[in-house]
Amino acid sequence: MPPKGWRKDAQGNYPTTSYIKEQENITIQDLLFPKSTIVNLAREVPQQSGKKLLINKDASLALQRGATVFVNHLLLFAREIAKSQDKKSCSVDDVLSALDHIGHSALKGPVRDKLDEYQAAVEQRKKEKLDSGEVDADGDIDMGEDKENVPVEKVKEHDEIEEQGDALQDVEESSEKKQKTESQDVETRVQNLEQT
């Protein structure tokens, strides 16, 4: 029996999950980028007067909606380009080609520059992590996702302790085997003496 509140359709069947998902209307409100992010990006635009940019509520809403529509429109064409090349995901080249396709080829330069800046910043963070000697417990470079950072020296020390522990365990096992064989030898000698 379906959950309470579900109604039968015209054929008398209860709706399936895919049917329900098709009935949901997705509005632009569901897709909007965070307002604070959009406003901060708008404030980063250099101004000739040097004064701080004030953006009122209506302007920030217009920027938020406009940015969302533009990015979704661009992604639609980037996906089509990727699909025409039998790719499952969009790459940077697909997005740049989509900019040409929608008539915004003048944006290719700034987009490429920002991408290069971002990639350089990521590489710089990786180098800083390597230079600081902080690695995850599993030996990978920490990119800020895990809270447990362990210095490289501690990881090496931990590995050495594990190796020493393994060696000690091997020695203990071999000494136990020796004792067993010696006790078996003594028992066989005693039995031989008793028989004679």
Swiss-Prot record:
The gene is DPB4. It is found in: Nucleus. GO terms for molecular function: chromatin DNA binding; nucleosomal DNA binding; protein heterodimerization activity. InterPro entries: DNA_Pol-Epsilon_Subunit, Histone-fold. DNA polymerase epsilon is a heterotetramer consisting of POL2, DPB2, DPB3 and DPB4. Component of the ISW2 complex, which at least consists of ISW2, ITC1, DLS1 and DPB4. This is DNA polymerase epsilon subunit D. Residues 144-159, 174-188 have a biased composition (Basic and acidic residues). In eukaryotes there are five DNA polymerases: alpha, beta, gamma, delta, and epsilon which are responsible for different reactions of DNA synthesis. Present with 2100 molecules/cell in log phase SD medium. SUPFAM superfamilies: Histone-fold (SSF47113). Residues 125-196 are annotated as: Disordered. Residues 133-143, 160-173 have a biased composition (Acidic residues). GO terms for cellular component: CHRAC; epsilon DNA polymerase complex; nuclear replication fork; nucleus. Signal peptide: none annotated. As accessory component of the DNA polymerase epsilon (DNA polymerase II) participates in chromosomal DNA replication. It is required during synthesis of the leading and lagging DNA strands at the replication fork and binds at/or near replication origins and moves along DNA with the replication fork. It has 3'-5' proofreading exonuclease activity that correct errors arising during DNA replication. It is also involved in DNA synthesis during DNA repair.
